[in-house]
Amino acid sequence: QAPAQLFQFGLAAEDEAREVSRRARADGLHRAAAMVPKGEWGDRVLKAFRQDWEANGGTLIGVEHVDQPVALAQQIADLFKLRQSEGRAKSLQSTVGTDIAAQPSRRQDIEFIFLAVTPQQAQQIKPTLNFQYAGDVPVYATSHVFSASGDKNQYNDMNGIMFCETPWLLNTTDPLRNQVATQWPQANGSLGRLYAMGVDAYRLAPRLGQLKALPDTRIDGLSGNLGMSPSQRIERQMPWAKFVSGQVERLPDTPR
C-alpha cells in the first residue's frame, strides 16, 4: 500500500507497450507476434504488452528476443515458419523429380508485429522483414524506434513502421516546445521527452487531488494524455506517427 501522498510519474516503457495493445485493438487486430531485445528491459516491456493484449482478448502467437544482427534473418524466418515452406518445396521437387520455381510462403496468422527496439535494430528488422516475404505485415512500435534525429536515411530504412510518441516530439509547432528549444536545442531531439515530462510534472502537481478524486479525468500533456491509476501512478496514452518515404507522418489519434 503506497503512502497517500505518494504519486508516481515517469516515461515508463510499459505504458507504451499497453498503448500498442490499445492501438492494435482499435484497428481490429487480434493475433500478434513480438520482437523485443534480449534482457530485463525487453522482458518487462513484453510482459506489459502480453498482459494487456491477452486481458483484452488478443493472442500472442510468437516472440523473438533480438540480440545479434547476424541472427536476425534466421529469427524472422523462424517466426514466420519460412524454412518449413522451403522444406515442403524441396520435398515436392524431390517427389516429382524436376526443378520447381517456388517462392517461400510465410505463415498467415500473424496480423501485426509488436516491436520495442532501438532505431539501429529497427533499421535492420524492417528491411529483413521485407526480404523474408513479411514486408506487408503491419509493425506497431514503441517510441524507442524514433531517434528524432531528422536522419532521412534512417527513417527510410524503417518505412511503414507505426509508432507511438510524445506530443512534444510530434507537435513541432507547439509554442512552448519551440520556446524551450530556443534556449536548449537538445529539446528538439530524443531528450525532448524528458523536457516534456518536466513540463507535465509541473502542471500535474496542482491537479493531483482532482485526478485522484475523479478517476476518469484526463489531462492533455506534452508527454501524452495523462490519467491516474488506482495505485496513484500517472499513466500515459500517446499519439501515433508513421515513417513514410523518409518523413514522419502524424496518424489520427486512437479512439478513447
Each model region followed by its residue ranges:
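Catalytic-loop motifs flanking and including active-site residues across diverse enzymes
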Residues: V45, Q121, M197-A201
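Generic recognition of flexible, low-complexity loop/linker segments
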Residues: S21, D99-Q103, K126-L129, G150, ...
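Amphipathic alpha-helical segments that form well-ordered structural scaffolds
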Residues: R23, A48, Q124, T128, ...
